[in-house]
């Protein structure tokens, strides 16, 4: 089933028939030893930390997919007000949360 997703509060030209509640996907990731070493070196000399960027992008995509699976479990065909949030888990990890409101349109 295809789910329409928007960061807005509605879908243009569509009527929301039912609000099903909040759906979310949460992923916690920590860098590998090699990513940590490379990140540490990059932080000293400056520049983009590619390994960390890639890790964060994969975590965002995984959290997004988990949110979609949560919505599908509720038989939703739309998600409105989709957002990302991140936080640190100690010094070892990063949490990525993707959330929104599941709806039937």
Curated annotation (Swiss-Prot):
Gene3D superfamilies: Hypothetical protein apc22750. Chain B. Transmembrane segments: none annotated. InterPro entries: UPF0145_dom_sf, UPF0145_YbjQ-like. Belongs to the UPF0145 family. PANTHER family: UPF0145 PROTEIN SCO3412 (PTHR34068:SF2), UPF0145 PROTEIN YBJQ (PTHR34068). This is UPF0145 protein lpl0253. It comes from Legionella pneumophila (strain Lens).
